[in-house]
C-alpha cells in the first residue's frame, strides 16, 4: 500500500466510486488532531522554558504549580483567541 489510501474507505459501494464526503470528514478530523498536537507541544515547550530552571529527575512543588498555572493560562488565552477568531469569521461570512 502507498499509505495515502490506507485509512480511507471508498464508502462501501461496489461501484468503486469514492465517497468524497467521508474522505473530507476524515481529512478534517486528521487536521484537528494535528492542530491539537501542535497546541499541546507549543504549550508544553513554553511552560517548560518558563517554569523549569534546572531540569532534574523530578519537579519540585513550585515547578509543578508553575507548570499547572502556565498551562491553565495558556489554554484560557487560546480559548479566548479562538472564540474571537471564530466570531470574526462568522461576521465576515455573513457579509458575503
Swiss-Prot record:
Entry GO terms, CC: mitochondrial inner membrane
GO terms for MF: metal ion binding
Motif Twin CX3C motif per UniProt: ranges: 47-70
Disulfide-bond pairs as recorded: 47-70, 51-66
Cellular compartments annotated: Mitochondrion inner membrane
Domain remark text: The twin CX3C motif contains 4 conserved Cys residues that form 2 disulfide bonds in the mitochondrial intermembrane space. However, during the transit of timm13-B from cytoplasm into mitochondrion, the Cys residues probably coordinate zinc, thereby preventing folding and allowing its transfer across mitochondrial outer membrane.
Biological function: Mitochondrial intermembrane chaperone that participates in the import and insertion of some multi-pass transmembrane proteins into the mitochondrial inner membrane. Also required for the transfer of beta-barrel precursors from the TOM complex to the sorting and assembly machinery (SAM complex) of the outer membrane. Acts as a chaperone-like protein that protects the hydrophobic precursors from aggregation and guide them through the mitochondrial intermembrane space.
Quaternary state and interactors: Heterohexamer; composed of 3 copies of TIMM8 (TIMM8A or TIMM8B) and 3 copies of TIMM13, named soluble 70 kDa complex. Associates with the TIM22 complex, whose core is composed of TIMM22.
Stated name of the protein: Mitochondrial import inner membrane translocase subunit Tim13-B
Native source organism of the sequence: Xenopus laevis (African clawed frog)
Taxonomic placement: Eukaryota, Metazoa, Chordata, Craniata, Vertebrata
Amino acid at each position: 500500500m502507498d499509505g495515502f489510501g490506507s485509512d480511507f474507505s471508498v464508502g462501501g459501494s461496489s461501484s468503486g466510486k469514492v465517497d468524497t464526503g467521508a474522505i473530507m470528514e476524515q481529512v478534517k478530523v486528521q487536521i484537528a488532531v494535528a492542530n491539537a498536537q501542535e497546541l499541546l507541544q507549543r504549550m508544553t515547550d513554553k511552560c517548560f522554558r518558563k517554569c523549569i530552571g534546572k531540569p532534574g529527575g523530578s519537579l519540585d512543588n513550585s515547578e509543578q504549580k508553575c507548570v499547572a498555572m502556565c498551562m491553565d493560562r495558556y489554554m484560557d488565552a487560546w480559548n479566548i483567541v479562538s472564540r474571537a477568531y471564530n466570531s470574526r469569521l462568522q461576521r465576515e461570512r455573513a457579509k458575503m
